[in-house]
């Protein structure tokens, strides 16, 4: 398109081959600029950003109050530090729950048996395992474990320990770690959940336990977690150390592996939120619905119409082959509302003098 427009403006006629040659010269040339809202490049205090690279305004808007680096970060990562300050909902939700209940979230036991059970069954919520909407687990609305994909992962693995949840977080955040890899190994009985690779640290620690040198184990882990496969000679060394073929094959398939510390942080927050779902349910749903309403994913007109209406709406959206992203996002909230009704809770009528402007408040033991 650019080449044809260029030729047309200049009244030139060239062969198809020349058009192709000119187009080849444009491949990879930047057309516009973008920005990562959480990406911050740190410049030493006694220097200016121009000492390292030119700067520009995002989308070439000179009136924008934001400046961005002209070069992509990887071209200067050896010289400058970049921070990715990503937003996260879970700490906000935990703060809300702490304020509503007076429970110190840091004192919630991470081995609470009833909380652990909801990752296998909905029984601690007073529900059966046969509801087609809720499914066989009780993790609707729990970060990390509330999507259809991760709930099925829980059904496949039947976790009973916190460590298994950390591994599952690694499976879901990695690339080519679960589907076509660990899932097949577990369901076929080739390996247990504990034996499979969930996070990058698992590889290094396993190889060291097999007697391989620390530095070599680290190098193999780094190569696999970046999606580069096994380094030269590593396969033979792993065979000699007694590493099974399925493990080596699993390493070859992985494109990206999540760090264990990151997975632990996510699962700790998820488990604490799950504790409130089991032991302080109304406060949990209040905080969850508020969070969804802030993302424009809570339609009060739909939610207040009762359990049967919500069930029909969920099935209606799920049966669509062309459901929009907004509708799919709405299903996430509707599932939590349906579960809320199934647990015997209900929404109180609006009261101009009692209601908060934005937040959901607990009225009594059922509302």
Q: Predicted regions: what is each one?
A:
Residues 1-367:
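Noncatalytic, beta-rich nucleic-acid-contacting surfaces in large DNA/RNA-processing enzymes
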């Amino acid at each position: 398109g650019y080449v044809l427009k260029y030729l047309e403006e200049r009244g030139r006629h060239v062969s198809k081959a020349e058009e192709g040659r000119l187009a080849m010269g444009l491949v990879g040339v930047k057309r516009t600029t973008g920005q990562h809202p959480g990406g911050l490049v740190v410049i030493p205090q006694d220097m200016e950003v121009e000492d390292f690279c030119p700067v520009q305004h995002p989308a070439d808007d000179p009136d924008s109050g934001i400046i961005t680096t002209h070069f992509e970060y990887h071209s200067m990562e050896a010289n400058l530090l970049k921070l990715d300050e990503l937003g996260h909902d879970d700490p906000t939700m935990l703060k809300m729950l702490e304020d509503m209940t007076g429970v110190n979230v840091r004192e919630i036991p991470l081995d609470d048996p009833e909380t652990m059970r909801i990752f296998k069954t909905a029984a601690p919520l007073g529900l059966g395992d046969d509801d087609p909407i809720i499914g066989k687990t009780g993790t609707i609305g729990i970060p990390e474990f509330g999507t259809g994909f991760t709930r099925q992962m829980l059904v496949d693995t039947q976790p009973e320990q916190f460590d298994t949840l950390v591994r599952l977080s690694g499976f879901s955040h990695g690339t080519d770690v679960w589907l076509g890899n660990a899932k097949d190994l577990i369901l076929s009985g080739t390996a247990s959940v504990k034996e499979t690779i969930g996070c990058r640290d698992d590889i290094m620690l396993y190889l060291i336990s097999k007697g391989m040198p620390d530095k070599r184990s680290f190098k193999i882990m780094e190569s696999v977690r970046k999606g580069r496969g096994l380094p030269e000679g590593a396969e033979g060394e792993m065979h000699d150390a007694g590493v099974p073929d399925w493990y080596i094959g699993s390493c070859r398939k992985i494109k990206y592996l999540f760090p264990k510390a990151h997975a632990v942080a996510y699962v700790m927050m998820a488990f604490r939120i799950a504790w409130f779902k089991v032991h302080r349910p109304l406060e949990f749903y209040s905080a969850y619905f508020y969070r969804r309403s802030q993302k424009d994913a809570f339609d009060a007109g739909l939610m207040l119409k009762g359990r049967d209406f919500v069930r029909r709406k969920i099935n209606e959206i799920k049966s669509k082959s062309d459901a929009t992203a907004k509708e799919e996002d709405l299903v996430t909230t509707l599932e939590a509302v349906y579960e809320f009704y199934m647990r015997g809770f209900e929404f109180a009528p609006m009261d101009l003098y009692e209601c908060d402007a934005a937040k959901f408040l607990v009225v009594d033991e059922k509302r």
